[in-house]
Swiss-Prot record:
<protein>
    <recommendedName>
        <fullName>Large ribosomal subunit protein uL29</fullName>
    </recommendedName>
</protein>
<dbReference type="InterPro" id="IPR001854">
    <property type="entry name" value="Ribosomal_uL29"/>
</dbReference>
<dbReference type="GO" id="GO:0003735">
    <property type="term" value="F:structural constituent of ribosome"/>
</dbReference>
<keyword id="KW-0689">Ribosomal protein</keyword>
<comment type="similarity">
    <text>Belongs to the universal ribosomal protein uL29 family.</text>
</comment>
<dbReference type="GO" id="GO:0006412">
    <property type="term" value="P:translation"/>
</dbReference>
<keyword id="KW-0687">Ribonucleoprotein</keyword>
<dbReference type="InterPro" id="IPR050063">
    <property type="entry name" value="Ribosomal_protein_uL29"/>
</dbReference>
<dbReference type="GO" id="GO:0022625">
    <property type="term" value="C:cytosolic large ribosomal subunit"/>
</dbReference>
<dbReference type="Pfam" id="PF00831">
    <property type="entry name" value="Ribosomal_L29"/>
</dbReference>
<dbReference type="InterPro" id="IPR036049">
    <property type="entry name" value="Ribosomal_uL29_sf"/>
</dbReference>
Length: 69
C-alpha cells in the first residue's frame, strides 16, 4: 500500500489497517516457525506497511496538535 493511499484514509481506518497488519505479521511468524511459510518476502512487506501506517498516524496527530495550538 502506498503512502499516498494511506494519507487519504482517516485515523480510524489507519488504526484498523494497523491491527490487520499486526495480525498478519503474527500469523506469518507462526508459519515461519512451523516451516509452512511460502512467501518469506511477505513478512518484510507487512512489517514495512505497518511502519508506514504508524508514521502517517503520527503525522496526522502532529498536524492536529499544531492546528489546535
Amino acid at each position: 500500500m502506498s503512502a499516498q493511499e494511506l494519507r487519504d484514509k482517516t485515523p480510524d481506518q489507519l488504526r484498523d489497517e494497523l491491527t490487520a497488519l499486526k495480525k498478519e505479521a503474527f500469523n506469518l511468524r507462526f508459519q515461519q516457525a512451523t516451516g509452512q511459510i511460502e512467501n518469506t518476502a511477505r513478512m518484510r512487506q507487512v512489517r514495512r506497511d505497518a511502519a508506514r501506517v504508524k508514521t502517517i498516524l503520527n503525522e496526522k496527530a502532529a498536524a492536529a496538535a499544531n492546528a489546535e495550538a
